């Protein structure tokens, strides 16, 4: 984790005081929440494939340029195996909809709004995200 802590300090200017592992979702990457005394949490990612990491970082930059709501990659290690990205919190969409699923699909108005916003964003990601995308 030293490489993530060094990357954090170089990027933020602050010492990392906590580096806590967080669960990954079906990925071979390892994820960590890094914070300093002032807060400033970032997610540190350690991958095993430079190509996969490069693709993720490229897509993040492309989607941000396209004004799409995706995590920003802040820093990438020299070897391309580690990077820092925005910390979007602990709650996934799947988690946020759990109560509605448990109630047999009877979602609250808040849960329905989350679903509506998510579904509405998908075509935008496909259309705007596909413009000028290097598919090679």
Residue ranges of predicted features:
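Short linear sequence motifs
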Residues: 1, 24-25, 49, 56
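ATP-binding pocket architecture of kinase catalytic cores
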Residues: 32-136
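ATP-binding glycine-rich phosphate-binding loop
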Residues: 14-35
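Juxta-kinase regulatory segment immediately upstream of eukaryotic protein kinase catalytic domains
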Residues: 1-20
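A short linear-motif detector with a strong N-terminal bias
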Residues: 10-13, 22-24, 62-64, 104
């Amino acid at each position: 984790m030293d490489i993530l802590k060094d990357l954090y300090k170089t990027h933020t200017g602050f010492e990392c005081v906590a580096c806590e592992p967080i669960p990954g979702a079906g990925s071979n990457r390892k994820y960590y929440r890094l914070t300093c005394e002032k807060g400033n949490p970032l997610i540190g990612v350690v991958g095993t494939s430079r190509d996969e990491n490069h693709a993720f970082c490229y897509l993040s930059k492309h989607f941000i340029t396209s004004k799409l709501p995706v995590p920003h990659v802040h820093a990438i290690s020299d070897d391309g195996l580690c990077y820092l990205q925005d910390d979007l919190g602990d709650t996934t969409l799947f988690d946020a909809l759990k109560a509605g699923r448990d109630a047999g699909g009877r979602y609250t108005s808040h849960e329905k709004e989350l679903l509506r916003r998510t579904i509405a964003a998908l075509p935008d990601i496909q259309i705007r995200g596909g413009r000028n995308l290097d598919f090679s």
